[in-house]
């Protein structure tokens, strides 16, 4: 008999929200997870009304405090197995901390929180209470990101010399927040988004892609945070030169004022033997450039190890993971679903054994979240000193 689906409670995601919708589809993707409850707004009345108008029946709560407190009295099969936090950045820390203290696993939107101090407290809480925690860096959920990770970390490109990791958008090329557009309004508000707008919103994705694929850390930064739209309170253009932990260099860049760009996340990794290129807007394939050879394009579900580049020893688990034939497109929702699927496996193991160990190979961890905040805070300091080189703090 199959185990019952995991029950998921949602914090945030009410009227005007965006990211809750792909997240919710991802939760239901495999039939082994379901949304059963929600505290969908910081306004108690709005939270209850949003739950009543949800596309399917869920238990609505006036606040996340009430939802977390209610778990103690529920039968085991009705308790929440994990919480999904999809609020603006300023409202990540408190519900995450309260859930961890209550022994409820957390799947949190990025960035982790508002400050490095908050991030450090969350890291300590995860370790103290031994509760599963995942951070929603969507793009590492693409299968081609997993293949890229294997290629680079196996040394097939040689030693990494240079990485260009970027996320370019154009939707904030005008002062959209002045029109009352919800997503623009909170992302450009320092009280809700934190110290960096563009960097916190999408620059952290570019950083995570670099770290996930290469396994390298950023040691020093020379950052330039710029605001092109008059009257905007946070950066809308983010450029960071980086020294990497292996002695290589990188450029982590993000922009939200480049007209014509949609969600253009991409990474190019150049090593001593070749270069890998991948773009999230074309997530089904990656390209390998080798000296004096035709380019190699690898498509999901159409990869043949032992082809002269990928070794026969390419992990069978990696090769077997995609379920759709090549040409039937995977996309944004599939990437989210892969993250939730991997987190579900860890939650179930934790429930069965009491042990939780996240190695960072399947989804972003609490330590990745801390590193993202350390990166942002160091970039803010560097930019404030006209791009002066500054070292990131040591890992917590």
Predicted regions and their residues:
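N-terminal Rossmann-like dinucleotide-binding module
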Residues: 1-55
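C-terminal helix-rich "cap/oligomerization" subdomain common to oxidoreductases
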Residues: 1-4, 328-331, 338-396
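Conserved acidic residues
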Residues: 36, 58, 81
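A structured beta-alpha segment of the ubiquitous adenosine-cofactor-binding alpha/beta core
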Residues: 61-80
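Beta-strand-loop-alpha-helix segment that lines the small-molecule cofactor/substrate pocket
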Residues: 82, 88-141, 155
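Predominantly a Rossmann-like dinucleotide-binding segment in NAD(P)-dependent oxidoreductases
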Residues: 132, 139-232, 286, 386
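Glycine-rich, aromatic-lined ligand/substrate-binding cores of catalytic
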Residues: 200-285
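C-terminal glycine/acidic-rich active-site capping loop/insertion
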Residues: 244, 273-363
């Amino acid at each position: 008999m199959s185990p019952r689906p995991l029950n998921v409670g949602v914090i945030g995601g009410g009227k005007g929200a965006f990211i809750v919708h792909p997240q919710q589809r991802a939760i239901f993707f495999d039939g082994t997870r379901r949304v059963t409850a929600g505290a969908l707004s910081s306004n108690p009345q709005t939270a209850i009304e949003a739950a009543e108008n949800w596309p399917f029946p869920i238990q609505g709560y006036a606040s996340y405090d009430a939802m977390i407190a209610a778990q103690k009295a529920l039968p085991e099969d009705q308790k929440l197995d994990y919480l999904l936090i999809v609020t603006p950045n300023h409202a990540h820390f408190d519900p995450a901390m309260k859930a961890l203290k209550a022994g409820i696993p957390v799947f949190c939107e990025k960035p982790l929180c508002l400050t490095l101090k908050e991030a450090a407290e969350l890291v300590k809480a995860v370790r103290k209470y031994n509760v599963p925690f995942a951070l929603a860096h969507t793009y590492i959920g693409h299968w081609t990101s997993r293949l890229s990770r294997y290629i680079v970390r196996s040394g097939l490109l040689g030693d990494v010399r240079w990485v260009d990791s970027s996320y370019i958008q154009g939707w904030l090329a005008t002062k959209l927040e002045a029109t009352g557009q919800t997503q623009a309004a909170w992302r450009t508000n320092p009280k809700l988004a934190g110290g960096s707008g563009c960097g916190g919103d999408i620059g952290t994705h570019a950083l995570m892609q670099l770290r996930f694929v290469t396994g390298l850390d950023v040691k020093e930064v020379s950052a330039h945070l710029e605001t092109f739209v008059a009257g905007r309170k946070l950066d809308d253009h983010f450029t960071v030169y980086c020294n990497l932990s292996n002695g290589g260099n990188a450029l982590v860049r993000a922009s939200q004022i480049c007209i014509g760009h949609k969600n253009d996340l991409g990474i190019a990794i150049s090593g001593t033997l070749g270069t890998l290129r991948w773009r999230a807007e074309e997530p089904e394939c990656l390209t390998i450039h080798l000296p004096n050879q035709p380019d190699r394009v690898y498509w999901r579900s159409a990869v043949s190890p032992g082809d002269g580049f990928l070794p026969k020893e390419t992990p069978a688990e990696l090769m077997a993971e995609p379920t759709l034939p090549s040409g039937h497109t995977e996309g944004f929702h599939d990437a989210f679903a892969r993250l939730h699927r991997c987190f579900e496996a860890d939650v179930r193991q934790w429930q069965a054994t009491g042990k939780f160990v996240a190695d960072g190979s399947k989804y972003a961890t609490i330590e990745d979240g801390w590193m993202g905040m350390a990166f942002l805070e160091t970039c803010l300091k560097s930019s404030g000193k006209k791009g002066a080189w500054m070292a990131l703090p040591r890992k917590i």
